[in-house]
């Protein structure tokens, strides 16, 4: 049987000093024989998705101690992408993922913790903690803060979210009063932004990976039902410890649960629900940390056979996360994938012996369990609040309409090909990514003239100054992991194109990335990035570019000979922006850039550079 890791600091005469310090934290004699379970919280008052997490770590801690464990809580940082967006703050967002992963590793290994409860929610926090969990490979469970309620206003016939506020603000025809009303209404409660943006996408994927409880991705932050997820997580992590340390059951370890097949399940879910393209970046990074050979070619393969079974804002205005929950949440989508013969159902999870068993219990179309049906009726109260578990509103009925509802069956899919696609071509030899769920079918094949911008800032200025015309393909380069550094999100350029009426008349290609709130023909993650010698750095104003989503291709319509000549010329100049950018790149960001790989590798550190150290 494996020993508790914590035995290193709790047992033996030589550890008297360490035990003295443990006692100063409140531990007693009997506690030194129990598993020490780390609670990695991410509470901060900077982020609406985390503002309500302050007391939830102790809620979990009390449940852990009731179940026979010792709980010790610590905090990580959390960056709000929406607040950091549109200025140099966005340079820090993706690098914060690595800092979070390192922080969890540092705390857990420094104190020899036996297991982890990860309390995450927003964009980089769940991925960072997931990377750490797979590095450490000790029992873990994820429980997130949950999505916020969609906004409501008499000025709109649909639920609102952050993107609506951004788009209306960029619309010069909208009055100041209307903009103010949207601003006040778009984000009414605590929780991660209400659409299928990056945060909610990742929290849903933890369910598919088998590392979180059913409902983790869809139960509203404000709803009383979410409290039970935290309490159950506390009990479950102690049970996982007993199985691993007491029974030598390695099937409960994260690398046993989140194996190659589980990553395929998670990616199939992402494609089926039209999730954020950022999830591709984060899944690739997590796979590397878990030593799972899952790469962009696997994602390309899956994208060709998985239909889109769910459509949520920003891909459609009608539905938000509260509607996904009402339709049965993630296990209803997984159930549809299973019945379509795609899902791997023989895999264990932290809560069930197999995914098949979990679907039978939690898919509302497969179970008659009234408690499960009641759980998925949890809905919004429409009351602005920053308090978790503060309301208990329920829908009168479930949305189990698989023909016209939020979640569809295979036979009635929104589209037979899923919501994400990987494109390859001479402009992106290692691939680039587009969220097809947000692209109008009329522009799935698009040929246009390149309009070059050397930064997101210059692109925003150009779009607002009407320099971009219908038929243009906006190229924003040197914004990759290394070139930015930090791989900024491009939500403002896409929002402004939309507000200018160019959402279906233009495309955008970048080696940066996009917010989960992005829609339109927006192609990101171009790899290799410009700063790494990628061909996106060779494009010139007026060059023709052909995008062909059905054939998964994107090509610069320039001869190989011309490209070779341009490469020789660029090698002499150096792979850097053609214009000076007024951007302060600190030592911390330079350190990140030094080791950063391109997006096709998940933008993780280049471990080859560290070998031998």
From Swiss-Prot:
<dbReference type="InterPro" id="IPR037237">
    <property type="entry name" value="IlvD/EDD_N"/>
</dbReference>
<keyword id="KW-0100">Branched-chain amino acid biosynthesis</keyword>
<comment type="similarity">
    <text>Belongs to the IlvD/Edd family.</text>
</comment>
<dbReference type="InterPro" id="IPR000581">
    <property type="entry name" value="ILV_EDD_N"/>
</dbReference>
<feature type="binding site">
    <location>
        <position position="123"/>
    </location>
    <ligand>
        <name>Mg(2+)</name>
    </ligand>
</feature>
<keyword id="KW-0001">2Fe-2S</keyword>
<protein>
    <recommendedName>
        <fullName>Dihydroxy-acid dehydratase</fullName>
        <ecNumber>4.2.1.9</ecNumber>
    </recommendedName>
</protein>
<dbReference type="InterPro" id="IPR020558">
    <property type="entry name" value="DiOHA_6PGluconate_deHydtase_CS"/>
</dbReference>
<dbReference type="Pfam" id="PF24877">
    <property type="entry name" value="ILV_EDD_C"/>
</dbReference>
<comment type="function">
    <text>Functions in the biosynthesis of branched-chain amino acids. Catalyzes the dehydration of (2R,3R)-2,3-dihydroxy-3-methylpentanoate (2,3-dihydroxy-3-methylvalerate) into 2-oxo-3-methylpentanoate (2-oxo-3-methylvalerate) and of (2R)-2,3-dihydroxy-3-methylbutanoate (2,3-dihydroxyisovalerate) into 2-oxo-3-methylbutanoate (2-oxoisovalerate), the penultimate precursor to L-isoleucine and L-valine, respectively.</text>
</comment>
<feature type="binding site">
    <location>
        <position position="193"/>
    </location>
    <ligand>
        <name>[2Fe-2S] cluster</name>
    </ligand>
</feature>
<dbReference type="InterPro" id="IPR056740">
    <property type="entry name" value="ILV_EDD_C"/>
</dbReference>
<feature type="binding site">
    <location>
        <position position="122"/>
    </location>
    <ligand>
        <name>[2Fe-2S] cluster</name>
    </ligand>
</feature>
<feature type="binding site">
    <location>
        <position position="489"/>
    </location>
    <ligand>
        <name>Mg(2+)</name>
    </ligand>
</feature>
<feature type="binding site">
    <location>
        <position position="81"/>
    </location>
    <ligand>
        <name>Mg(2+)</name>
    </ligand>
</feature>
<dbReference type="GO" id="GO:0004160">
    <property type="term" value="F:dihydroxy-acid dehydratase activity"/>
</dbReference>
<dbReference type="GO" id="GO:0009099">
    <property type="term" value="P:L-valine biosynthetic process"/>
</dbReference>
<comment type="pathway">
    <text>Amino-acid biosynthesis; L-isoleucine biosynthesis; L-isoleucine from 2-oxobutanoate: step 3/4.</text>
</comment>
<dbReference type="InterPro" id="IPR004404">
    <property type="entry name" value="DihydroxyA_deHydtase"/>
</dbReference>
<keyword id="KW-0479">Metal-binding</keyword>
<dbReference type="GO" id="GO:0009097">
    <property type="term" value="P:isoleucine biosynthetic process"/>
</dbReference>
<dbReference type="GO" id="GO:0051537">
    <property type="term" value="F:2 iron, 2 sulfur cluster binding"/>
</dbReference>
<keyword id="KW-0456">Lyase</keyword>
<dbReference type="GO" id="GO:0000287">
    <property type="term" value="F:magnesium ion binding"/>
</dbReference>
<dbReference type="Pfam" id="PF00920">
    <property type="entry name" value="ILVD_EDD_N"/>
</dbReference>
<feature type="active site" description="Proton acceptor">
    <location>
        <position position="515"/>
    </location>
</feature>
<dbReference type="GO" id="GO:0005829">
    <property type="term" value="C:cytosol"/>
</dbReference>
<keyword id="KW-0408">Iron</keyword>
<feature type="binding site" description="via carbamate group">
    <location>
        <position position="124"/>
    </location>
    <ligand>
        <name>Mg(2+)</name>
    </ligand>
</feature>
<keyword id="KW-0460">Magnesium</keyword>
<feature type="modified residue" description="N6-carboxylysine">
    <location>
        <position position="124"/>
    </location>
</feature>
<comment type="pathway">
    <text>Amino-acid biosynthesis; L-valine biosynthesis; L-valine from pyruvate: step 3/4.</text>
</comment>
<dbReference type="InterPro" id="IPR042096">
    <property type="entry name" value="Dihydro-acid_dehy_C"/>
</dbReference>
<comment type="subunit">
    <text>Homodimer.</text>
</comment>
<keyword id="KW-0028">Amino-acid biosynthesis</keyword>
<keyword id="KW-0411">Iron-sulfur</keyword>
């Amino acid at each position: 049987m494996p020993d508790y890791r914590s035995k290193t600091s709790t047992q033996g005469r030589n550890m008297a000093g360490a035990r003295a310090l443990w006692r100063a934290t409140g531990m007693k004699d009997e506690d030194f024989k129990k598993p020490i379970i780390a609670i990695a919280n991410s509470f901060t008052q900077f982020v609406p998705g985390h503002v309500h997490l302050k007391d939830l770590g102790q809620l979990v801690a009390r449940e852990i101690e009731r179940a026979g464990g010792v709980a010790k809580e610590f905090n990580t940082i959390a960056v709000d992408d929406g607040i950091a967006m549109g200025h140099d703050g966005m340079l820090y967002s993706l690098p914060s993922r690595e800092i979070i992963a390192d922080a969890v590793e540092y705390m857990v290994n420094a104190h020899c913790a036996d297991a982890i409860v990860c309390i995450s929610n927003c964009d980089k926090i769940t991925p960072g903690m997931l990377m750490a969990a797979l590095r450490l490979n000790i029992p873990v469970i994820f429980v997130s803060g949950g999505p916020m309620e969609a906004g409501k206003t008499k000025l709109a016939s649909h639920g609102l979210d952050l993107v609506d506020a951004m788009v209306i603000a960029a619309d010069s025809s909208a009055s100041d009063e209307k903009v103010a009303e949207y601003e006040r209404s778009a984000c009414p409660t605590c929780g991660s932004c209400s659409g299928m943006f990056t945060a909610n996408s990742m929290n849903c994927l933890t369910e598919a990976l088998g590392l979180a409880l059913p409902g983790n991705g869809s139960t509203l932050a404000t709803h009383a039902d979410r409290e039970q997820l935290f309490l159950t997580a506390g009990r479950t992590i102690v049970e996982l410890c007993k199985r691993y340390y007491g029974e030598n059951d390695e099937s409960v370890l994260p690398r046993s649960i989140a194996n190659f097949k589980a990553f395929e399940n998670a990616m199939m879910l992402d494609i089926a629900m039209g999730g954020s393209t950022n999830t591709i970046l984060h899944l690739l990074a997590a796979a590397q940390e878990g030593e799972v050979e899952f790469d962009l070619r696997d994602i390309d393969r899956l994208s060709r056979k998985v239909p889109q079974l769910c459509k949520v804002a920003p891909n459609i205005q009608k539905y938000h996360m509260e509607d996904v929950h009402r339709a049965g949440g993630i296990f209803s989508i997984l159930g549809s994938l299973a019945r379509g013969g795609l899902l791997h159902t023989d895999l264990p999870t932290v809560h069930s012996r197999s995914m098949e068993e979990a679907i039978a219990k939690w898919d509302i179309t497969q179970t008659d369990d009234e408690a499960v049906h009641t759980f998925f009726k949890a809905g919004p109260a429409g009351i602005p609040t920053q308090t978790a578990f503060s309301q208990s509103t329920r829908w009168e009925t479930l949305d189990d309409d698989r023909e016209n509802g939020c979640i569809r069956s295979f036979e009635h899919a929104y589209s037979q090909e899923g919501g994400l696609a990987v494109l390859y071509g001479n402009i992106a030899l290692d691939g680039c990514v587009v969220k097809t769920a947000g692209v109008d079918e009329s522009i799935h094949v698009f040929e246009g003239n390149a309009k070059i911008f050397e930064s997101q800032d210059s692109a925003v200025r150009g779009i607002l100054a009407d320099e971009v015309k219908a038929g243009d393909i906006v190229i924003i380069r040197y914004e990759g992991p290394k070139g930015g550094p930090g791989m900024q999100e491009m939500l403002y350029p896409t929002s402004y194109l939309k507000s200018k009426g160019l959402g279906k008349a233009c495309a955008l290609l970048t080696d940066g990335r996009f917010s989960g709130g992005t829609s339109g023909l927006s192609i990101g993650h171009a790899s290799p990035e410009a700063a790494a010698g990628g061909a996106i750095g060779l494009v010139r104003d007026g060059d023709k570019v052909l995008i062909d989503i059905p054939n998964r291709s994107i090509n610069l319509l320039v001869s190989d000979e011309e490209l070779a000549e341009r490469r020789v010329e660029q090698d002499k100049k150096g792979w850097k922006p053609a214009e000076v950018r007024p951007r302060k790149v600190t030592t911390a960001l330079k350190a990140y850039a030094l080791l950063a790989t391109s997006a096709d590798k998940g933008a993780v550190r280049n471990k080859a550079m560290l070998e031998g150290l």
